[in-house]
Amino acid sequence: PVSASIRLLDSSKGGATIGATPMESDSSVSALSGSSASKVSRRGRRRSHLASKSSAPTQAKLVALASNGVPEPVGVLEEAFSSLEDARAATSNAANDAAPPAAAPAVDHTVAPDVSTAAKIAATTATAATAAARAGQAAMMAELSATQRMVRNSFRSLGGVDTEELSCAISRYDELVMALMLRCGELETRLAMPPPPPPPSKANTTAANAPQMPQVAPIAAPRTTKVRETWSAVVKCDDPALSGKAIAEKVRTMVAPSLGVRVHEVRELPSRWWCDHSYSSVGELQKVMASKRFAELGLNVARNAAEKPKVIVYDVDTAIGPEEFMQELHENNFDSEMTLAQFKKSVHLVTKAWSATDGATVNVTLEVDDRAMAKLDVGRVYIKWFSFRCRSQVRTYACHRCVGFDHKVSECRQKESVCRQCGQQGHTAAKCQNPVDCRNCRHRGQPSGHYMLSNACPIYGALLARVQARH
């Protein structure tokens, strides 16, 4: 408990003597309600306005009262102000001491602490502090109300004194009481909040009871499949008497040994053309196209028109329509090298028509010939006042039957399809209830918790990276 004294005029003795009113508090008091606070504030402003009009006769009357043995009210209130300041400091100290932090119990590192017991102790401490605060609140409210009534009655007993000066003093007294009660309300709010429970701490485990992890042998890095890129060239002959089988045999025996490239396949086409599939790099295809041996044997070689290279232009604004895109592509990138008619034969739009309602941007795919490909190989195209990133689209074969690489479904040796989600046979990914498991990574001893043929697959990602590096 904290005791404090407020110096005030005792109305029961005519205001001639000064008494003391003890004030006890266990913790703090709460603030006035909103309506009471507003009322006191309005009263204080009105009294301050009246006090500003204090006149000299009022001061003379106060001096006369003091000479007759009546103490000056303002001086008495000044002492009351000082006492109230002491009371506010004492209340603050009481609030700080009302809920001392609980001493931390000794922690046994071999046994996990009981979190529920610690929480109960903290809750009990907070409840006791709140009850003490509310008990002190009632006592303080009663004391402050009685103090205000006694001061006002003392002022009324002073006859012949101008009330303006007394109103100013009462206003100052009310403001100080209001500040004290607001401060006590803040302290009570802080006391009413329960302390946070202690954080749970894990028990230290000894080496004896620590779980033993199984020893796993290190997995060697798996061998990744070598990337195979397939390009095709078509050979035609002007001699109608020469069959497709004869053309293929002539190329196999008379042309292929002098090409200096690895020929993957030589087969006959229905139109009596011959198709040469080479692989490993674009440079090998260029060697086949530049060979003069074909002309010496009366053969014409050209790249397969069905496999024109493709270029992707990224993040094109959908506000630019397809026709406007192609027109700007020619004017800003190909105008100095080919006419509009030549451009339309060399560059074809593969992406279906888009509009502004399809989103903010769209990736545009173009099918180009070798001449246009050399121009777009710089990596940037200019449309209107924008510059867009572009890159050649590299084709990598992936089998959707066995989910392997380097061959198509028509070339797959496996007869039954596997699920793309778990890599097992007998069902499809749409009806699969098994967890995600990459068949390719599992066979190579790598983490397999991802989809096959996805960006999360390290094997498929390495394949794409190597293919892109060759271009």
UniProtKB/Swiss-Prot annotation:
A zinc finger (CCHC-type) spans 397-414, 417-434. Coiled coil: none annotated. SMART domains: ZnF_C2HC. Keywords: Metal-binding, Repeat, Transposable element, Zinc, Zinc-finger. Residues 438-457 are annotated as: Gag-like cysteine motif. The keyword Transferase does not apply. To corresponding ORF of B.mori (R1BM). This is Uncharacterized 50 kDa protein in type I retrotransposable element R1DM. The gene is R1A1-element\ORF1.
